[in-house]
From Swiss-Prot:
The gene coding this protein: ASZ1
Low complexity composition bias: residue spans: 1-10
Quaternary data: Interacts with DDX4, PIWIL1, RANBP9 and TDRD1.
Lineage of the species this protein comes from: Eukaryota, Metazoa, Chordata, Craniata, Vertebrata
This protein's UniProt keywords: ANK repeat, Cytoplasm, Developmental protein, Differentiation, Meiosis, Phosphoprotein, Repeat, RNA-mediated gene silencing, Spermatogenesis
Cytoplasm listed as a keyword: yes
First and last residues of every ANK repeat: 45-74, 78-107, 110-144, 148-177, 181-210, 214-243
Protein name from the UniProt record: Ankyrin repeat, SAM and basic leucine zipper domain-containing protein 1
Subcellular location: Cytoplasm
GO biological process, one term: transposable element silencing
Function description: Plays a central role during spermatogenesis by repressing transposable elements and preventing their mobilization, which is essential for the germline integrity. Acts via the piRNA metabolic process, which mediates the repression of transposable elements during meiosis by forming complexes composed of piRNAs and Piwi proteins and governs the methylation and subsequent repression of transposons. Its association with pi-bodies suggests a participation in the primary piRNAs metabolic process.
Amino acid sequence: MAAGALRGLAVAGGGESSESEDDGWEIGYLDRASQKLKGPLPIEEKNETFKKALTTGDISLVQELLDSGISVDSSFRYGWTPLMYAASVANVELVRVLLDRGANASFDKDKQTILITACSARGLEEQILKCVELLLSRNADPNVACRRLMTPIMYAARDGHPQVVALLVAHGAEVNTQDENGYTALTWAARQGHKNVVLKLLELGANKMLQTKDGKIPSEIAKRNKHLEIFNFLSLTLNPLEGNLQQLTKEETICKLLTTESDKEKDHLFSSYTAFGDLEIFLHGLGLEHMTDLLKEKDITLRHLLTMRKDEFTKNGINDKDQQKILSALKELEVEEIKFGELPEVAKLEISGDEFLNFLLKLNKQCGHLITAVQNIITELPVNSHKIVLEWASPRNFTSVCEELVNNVEDLSEEVCKLKDLIQKLQNERENDPTHIPLMEEVSTWNSRILKRTAIAVCGFGFLLFICKLTVQRK
């Protein structure tokens, strides 16, 4: 990091703030004239100069001060060491210099380790990754937790750093450890909406069924935080990615997960990890990664893929086996559309409870489908007007329709509340009605048992007959 590049105050990583807004660090630029020592300095002045050199990222001055005898593990106000500060701002060169001078990579302050501080640093993932790699090379333990029982991998997952997650696991980090609230790294990634991290954790063997203390699994956490794409992906029962990398050695895992770009490209990239889009995540979840290039060549989006017919699959070169995987996944995610002409008329007294419950369930599913559709539109809508390629009508038209839509949603909410109150009223009246006879539990009689057995026998015979007929036809 260049001298003077930092202006912000360093705080403890992972949301664990220090005891004061002023951690003893003076933020700002150091006068060029004072960057070289002009003779021996008193200890207090030397410490102050050391802090300023760390703050501005002045590597040469830091080295000069260390050469003059100042301790590399100096404890500043509130217990932070120079290495902890350098890690908190992801200053790779400063971290390297301090480690080479003997700084303790395993230091912690109130269970806030330097590795945790690095994983929760603010900066580019590439810089954070290099800092973490340096600390791990000096035997920093990736499984030491903070006061909230959060480990480095949880902080990396929470902040959306898939490469850092992969590196930590390659050095022995536990994927499925839980914090004080029962959150795993996967839960944190799902909560924050980091789909790349979710995908990587599943590949590394993360358990998507581990519950938090309030009984929620990662998919439910994602849904609660309106990350419906991740919710749908985690809800798929088929997960061929799970544990794909668990059998590899440490060296093989690092090589596979951290393939870097050429030196010329490193300075221009946020990371060397490929960002996955909606289509890639869907295909990875089904083990259909080989289809990615084919679909991209034909400009087929995820939305188009999900609405394809049988003949379109074949026309686009998708074989029957892959078609079946896609259709099976769609069936799991399918939201049944309501045909209002077929809905029961609530006014009829002979309507059954099952029919009415089915109506409410369908209505609820349809609302969820509408929410997902609107969220997808919000995600894909250009933020800046200059990114719109085709000419649009006046935005006022869209705004007015949205206002009408909001009014309709409010009206729907009001009517549903009325329906809920009415059902509650009917339930209370029924419970207080002295003439109401509660439903008796169904008692299995001798006749009913015979009837059930007869029905099972008939069904079994019919199935056997069907198999025989099918065999004859094939011959």
